[in-house]
């Protein structure tokens, strides 16, 4: 645990230095076609320790009961839920969310992954010490539910500018970026399209640290847009631990 303790010291220094800086509002956007992850969405939104935030959800499945979803979030005045026909692509749904956003920063989050309490704060702080317009994580933890294994993917791309890729569920960017680029009008690779357009236009991207986010790899590939088996993805990762308590490794 020495490595995480060293990181904790560094990250806490940054938090302390920037604690009195103005924290702009953030519009969290996500799409879902499954109601079974609504509890996870709820828990992530509650957990994230960031004062000025809103959540915009697009239901991209005609069979989902929108009223059921509204009732789930009835205690929030900063959550809005829309329903868009399932024939509309994921990229189009995300671009729709951006148009609805009332804040100047957009955070794309996934419905089934894990986000720690300081996830958004640490990501927003990066804008204070870089000139990047797009922030995210390349190095990131992966939890394999099938095996109870916590692993690390892309460990070499961390705390540096990047022109390659960022994990799709961790994208945080200035809303003004969408004056020049959009998510791709596709169901797979909509974020890759955005990165490519950013590179073409000289929009800088920065990969932050690996902490406070976990990509949850489910046993059933139908639960994922990206159809890759657990064994194949695991072969691309570095195993950290066999554990049912991944939070102790990833939360700072």
Where on the chain are the PLM-derived regions?
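N-proximal low-complexity "stem/linker" segments adjacent to membrane-targeting elements
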Residues: 1-46
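Acidic donor-binding segment of Leloir-type glycosyltransferases
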Residues: 46-83
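Glycine-rich, basic loop-to-helix element that forms the pyrophosphate-binding segment
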Residues: 84-101
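Conserved catalytic core of nucleotide-sugar-dependent glycosyltransferases
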Residues: 99, 117-185
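Short aromatic/hydrophobic "clamp" motif used to bind/position activated sugar donors
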Residues: 106
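The conserved acidic donor/metal-binding loop of glycosyltransferases
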Residues: 110-114
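Catalytic beta-strand/loop signature of glycosyltransferases that borders the donor
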Residues: 138, 205-213
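Acidic donor-binding loop at a coil-to-helix junction in glycosyltransferase catalytic cores
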Residues: 188-196, 203
């Amino acid at each position: 645990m020495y490595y995480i303790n060293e990181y904790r010291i560094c990250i806490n220094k940054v938090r302390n230095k920037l604690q009195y800086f103005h924290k702009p509002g953030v519009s969290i956007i996500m799409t879902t076609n499954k109601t079974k992850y609504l509890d996870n969405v709820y828990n992530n939104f509650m957990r994230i320790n960031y004062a000025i935030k809103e959540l915009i959800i697009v239901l991209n499945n005609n069979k989902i009961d929108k009223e059921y979803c509204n009732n789930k979030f009835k205690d929030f005045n900063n959550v809005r839920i829309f329903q868009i026909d399932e024939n509309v692509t994921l990229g189009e749904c995300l671009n729709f969310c951006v148009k609805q956003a009332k804040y100047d920063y957009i955070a794309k989050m996934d419905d089934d992954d894990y986000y720690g309490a300081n996830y958004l704060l640490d990501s927003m702080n990066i804008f204070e010490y870089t000139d990047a317009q797009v922030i995210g994580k390349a190095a990131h933890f992966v939890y394999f539910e099938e095996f109870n294994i916590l692993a690390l993917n892309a460990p070499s791309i961390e705390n540096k500018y990047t022109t390659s890729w960022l994990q799709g569920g961790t994208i945080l960017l200035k809303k003004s970026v969408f004056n020049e680029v959009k998510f791709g009008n596709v169901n797979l690779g909509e974020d890759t399209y955005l990165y490519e357009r950013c590179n073409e236009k000289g929009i800088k991207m920065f990969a932050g640290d690996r902490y406070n986010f976990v990509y949850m790899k489910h046993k059933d590939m139908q639960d994922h847009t990206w159809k890759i088996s657990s064994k194949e993805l695991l072969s691309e990762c570095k195993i950290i631990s066999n554990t049912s308590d991944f939070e102790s490794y990833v939360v700072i």
